[in-house]
C-alpha cells in the first residue's frame, strides 16, 4: 500500500482571518445519523515554552470550523508561550508572524485557555474529545511534556480509539509532539513525521535552542517518515486517524488534513 501523503492545495486563507464578529460562537457539527453537537478538541500544552504558531493558528482554524477548543497542561496551570517567538532579536528570525501574534493576543484571553484541564488529575481523559493535538516547540519544557509518563498513559488509552477500522477519534502532532505518540504506542504500527535533521540544524543557525538530541532520533527508524524536501507537507497514517507535521510551516496544511480526517472518522 502506498504511503498516504497530504500535499498543499490552493486556498484563499479565509479560515485563518481574525474574527469579524466578537459575538461569534462555534457552530454545532454533527456525526452522521446522530443529533448535531459541537465537536471538541484538546490542545496539549507544556507549562511553559509552547510554540506560538503551532498552537495559535490551529486554535483559530478549528474554532472557526465550529469546534469547542479546550487546553490541557500537566499541572493545570495556565501555559506560558515561548517568549523568544514573540519579542526580542531572535523573534526576527524564528518568531511568529504579526497575524499569529494577533491570534495569540486573542486566544490567551479566552476562558478555555485561562482554565486548562489538569492532566495529572486521574479523572481526566482524552476520550471526551474528538480531536487531540500535541504541538511541539524548542523549549526544554516541551520535551519534558512529550516524555512524561502521564501523557503517555493518556495517549495509550486514546490512540486505539483512532483506529481507521473502528475508531471515531482523531489524533495530531507537530514536530516534537510526535515523540509523545511513539512513547505511548511502542507496540502499535503507527508512523509519524517530525522535524528532519536539515530543518532542525537550520533553526539552530537562526537562534533556536540546541536540544540534547535531534527530534527524529527519538522515533524508531521503522516508524519515522521523513517526507520530501518541500516547504509544506504532512503525513497521514495508514492505520489510524492520525496526522503529523514537521515544523511550524506545515501548520495550515496539517489543519486541512485534520479537517478531512475528522470528516472520515465521523462517517
Curated annotation (Swiss-Prot):
Any Gene Ontology CC annotation: Golgi apparatus
Top-level division of the source organism's lineage: Eukaryota
SUPFAM superfamilies, per the entry: Class I glutamine amidotransferase-like
InterPro entries the record matches: Class_I_gatase-like, ThiJ-like
Pfam families membership: ThiJ_like
Transmembrane feature ranges: none
Molecular function via GO: catalytic activity
Family statement drawn from the similarity comment of this UniProt entry: To S.pombe SpAC18G6.12c.
Name of this protein: Uncharacterized protein C14C4.04
Organism: Schizosaccharomyces pombe (strain 972 / ATCC 24843)
Amino acid at each position: 500500500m502506498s504511503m498516504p501523503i497530504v500535499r498543499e492545495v490552493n486556498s484563499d486563507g479565509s479560515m485563518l482571518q481574525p474574527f469579524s464578529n466578537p459575538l461569534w460562537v462555534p457552530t454545532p457539527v454533527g456525526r452522521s445519523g446522530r443529533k448535531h453537537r459541537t465537536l471538541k478538541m484538546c490542545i496539549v500544552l507544556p507549562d511553559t515554552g509552547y510554540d506560538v504558531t503551532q498552537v495559535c493558528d490551529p486554535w483559530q482554524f478549528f474554532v472557526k470550523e465550529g469546534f469547542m477548543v479546550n487546553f490541557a497542561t500537566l499541572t493545570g496551570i495556565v501555559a506560558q508561550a515561548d517568549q523568544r517567538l514573540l519579542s526580542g532579536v531572535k523573534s526576527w528570525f524564528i518568531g511568529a508572524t504579526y497575524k499569529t501574534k494577533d491570534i495569540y493576543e486573542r486566544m490567551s484571553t479566552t476562558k478555555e485557555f485561562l482554565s486548562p484541564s489538569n492532566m495529572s488529575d486521574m479523572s481526566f481523559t482524552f476520550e471526551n474529545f474528538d480531536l487531540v493535538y500535541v504541538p511541539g516547540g524548542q523549549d526544554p519544557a516541551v520535551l519534558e511534556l512529550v516524555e512524561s509518563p502521564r501523557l503517555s498513559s493518556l495517549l495509550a488509552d486514546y490512540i486505539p480509539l483512532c483506529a481507521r477500522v473502528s475508531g471515531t477519534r482523531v489524533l495530531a502532532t507537530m514536530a516534537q509532539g510526535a515523540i509523545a505518540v511513539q512513547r505511548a504506542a511502542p507496540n502499535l504500527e503507527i508512523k509519524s513525521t517530525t522535524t528532519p535533521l536539515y530543518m532542525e540544524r537550520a533553526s539552530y543557525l537562526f537562534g533556536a535552542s540546541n536540544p540534547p538530541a535531534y527530534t527524529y532520533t527519538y522515533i524508531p527508524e521503522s516508524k519515522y517518515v521523513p517526507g520530501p524536501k518541500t516547504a509544506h507537507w504532512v503525513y497521514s497514517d495508514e492505520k489510524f486517524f492520525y496526522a503529523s507535521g514537521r515544523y511550524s510551516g506545515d501548520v495550515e496544511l496539517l489543519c486541512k488534513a485534520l479537517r478531512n480526517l475528522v470528516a472520515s472518522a465521523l462517517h
